Amino acid sequence: MSKSIGILGAGIGGLHLALYLQKQGIAASVLTDRAPEQYAATRLMNTVAHHSVTIARENELGVNHWDDPQVVYHHHDHFFNFPDSGLLFRGAFQRPSRAVDYRIYLPALMKDFEDRGGLIEYASIQDDDIPALVSRFDLLVVSTGKGALGRMFAHRPELSPYTRPQRLLCVGLYDGVDHGSPDDDDPRGVTLSVSPGHGEMIVIPTLSFGGMKTALLMENIPGGDMADLVSLSYDANPAAFRQTLLDKLEKHHPHTYNRIDTHRFGLAQPLDLLQGAVVPTVRQSWVAFDGDKLAIALGDVHSVVDPLMGQGANMASYAAFELGKAITDAVAFDARFVEDVDRARENRVLAAARWTNMMLQPPSEAMGRLIFAMSQDRELCDEFTENFNYPERQWDRLASDKRIHAWIDRSGRIAA
């Protein structure tokens, strides 16, 4: 059968799908509004970590250009800023993860695709372009949610009930933060820091322009003491922004503050700051058009997760591969095709959404017990950490209080 695939959007989902189909000899065209050479001058897009399952897919596609022990990290440090005393413990990955600035990552993959003969069309897609695109391709994959593209796919509140952001984000790349080194006894790792009632911060060693930087991804609870960082202007007064941030880090995230060289601390460059919020959303996975044509959602168009658990990019890559396999095997692009795609990808994708949404809420008694148990049991914390690769396994353990207690008790583990 004819298989001409149109992919709207050049994020990780769209590019991993395009590169996968290219390997299978299937014609795929990527449509995007940003050329590779434009990325370097744009604002920070996100702070994304790729776990080992995603790096393995990059190896399969031949696009892992960052296979360097100087770039990867190996563990998560968990810090809870409790009033009486902080709680600090570590969980390790079986294989390392890494973070690369998407202003470097995405242009590199676009170049790979084009160098191998792939077609990328650079244009802004308007609402009235959609019917012609649907007619042009045998299957239209929508992996960008801009404008009418995202609105085509209805919200499924039974899978993600939120209608407003649960966190106010202040994300930046900084110099002057110690995140470990591959050359000493404290290898690079990510810190997951919690200030109860105020929010979380994820500290990520990240390869960016000029080498390794540190991403501070602040997930601030509306109404909390950190919340005003979402609107604090850096451009209006960089020194005031820096001092306000340092003061709040000292109060709410002291474990990270103590690793800051205050003489060197600051944004790596003015564009390395992103402020805003996202509404966690799961949408209908496809929409039908006249002429027996359909469009299928991929990545953030299908499921937008808060960045708290770092699942968005890893899920988009996973879903791209599952969709690519289904396209390769398809005999028709119809409702049955979509059922096959959804069956293949939804267990992991929906587990990531549900797990992340749960972690946005105050911890239950069972979750509090798990946190304490992980602080006492390195094997348990290692398992929790490795499951960042496999959110369906994590959700199997966290989906109810009964499951959490059973996980803790499984090997005779004892927790208060």
Segments from the language model and where they lie:
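Beta1/beta-strand and adjacent pyrophosphate-binding region of the FAD-binding site
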Residues: 1-13
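Conserved FAD/dinucleotide-binding core of flavoprotein oxidoreductases
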Residues: 194-273
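Central beta-strand plus flanking loop segment that forms part of the substrate or channel wall
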Residues: 153-191
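C-terminal helical "tail/cap" subdomain of flavin- and related membrane-associated enzymes
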Residues: 270, 309-310, 325-416
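Conserved mid-domain beta->alpha element of the FAD-binding
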Residues: 7, 275-355
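N-terminal FAD cofactor-binding segment of flavoenzymes
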Residues: 34-80
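Short beta-strand to alpha-helix junction loop
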Residues: 45-50, 92-108, 143, 149-150, ...
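Glycine-rich FAD pyrophosphate-binding loop
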Residues: 8-10, 19-43
